[in-house]
């Protein structure tokens, strides 16, 4: 999910994937930020790299630091052979440089009432306070409901395991992801694939981002615009 990982650094350098539905892949600041990504991942002169499994790379000591989902935290805590620490993502502009993440649970309007009732019961079970605390403590994701954060067992767990509290403390500094990544069908794969061409194949940044903008603009025009304008 390189498209998600790079959203924060991109913001911190003044770039963006989009402003609402206005795509920004070919804006000067976006191009400059992606040029920076290409530079720091240069095999000879860079100081970073992109791997297939950065949790494993970091957990085995091949990488000194990494940016990951909190969903990797519990596994790394159990397997890392060194003292593990977590920290806020850099926010040099003060405008937020950590994107929100995760997924959601929804009930389709077009299914039967019985299935809708079954779905809401399942969602209630998955997200109730007790199960939210269990899930958070055993995976690493931050609790998905505020009552779980205030749960006494959860409070004790986070006091004993402060790495699990970092994301909660950082939440006021987060920003919703740009529309271009989260609302355009297939956009995450397109963005990640474009970055892989740049980082791995060392392709020209401007050309790759121009092609990406054309692809995602077509997706918006043909699949999204007609729906949101109804």
Identify what each model region corresponds to.
Residues 35, 42-45, 77-142, 176, ...:
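Extracytoplasmic/periplasmic substrate-recognition and gating elements
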Residues 64-69, 85-87:
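Paired acidic/hydrophobic, glycine-rich loop segments that form the ligand-binding mouth/hinge
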């Amino acid at each position: 999910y390189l498209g998600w990982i790079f959203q924060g650094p991109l913001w911190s350098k003044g770039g963006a994937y989009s402003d609402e539905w206005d795509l920004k892949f070919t804006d000067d600041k976006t191009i400059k930020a992606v040029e920076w990504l290409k530079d720091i991942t240069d095999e000879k002169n860079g100081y970073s790299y992109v791997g297939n499994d950065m949790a494993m790379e970091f957990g085995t000591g091949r990488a000194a630091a990494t940016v990951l989902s909190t969903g990797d935290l519990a596994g790394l805590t159990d397997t890392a052979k060194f003292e593990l620490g977590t920290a806020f993502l850099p926010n040099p502009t003060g405008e937020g440089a950590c994107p929100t993440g995760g997924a959601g649970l929804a009930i389709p309007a077009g299914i039967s009432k019985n299935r809708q009732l079954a779905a809401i019961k399942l969602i209630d079970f998955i997200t109730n306070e007790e199960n939210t605390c269990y899930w958070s403590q055993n995976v690493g994701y931050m609790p998905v409901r505020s009552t779980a954060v205030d749960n006494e067992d959860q409070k004790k767990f986070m006091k004993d395991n402060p790495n699990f509290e970092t994301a909660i403390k950082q939440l006021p500094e987060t920003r919703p992801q740009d529309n271009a990544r989260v609302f355009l069908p297939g956009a995450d794969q397109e963005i990640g694939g474009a970055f892989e061409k740049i980082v791995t194949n060392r392709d020209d940044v401007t050309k790759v981002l121009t092609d990406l903008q054309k692809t995602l603009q077509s997706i918006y025009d043909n699949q999204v615009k007609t729906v949101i304008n109804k």
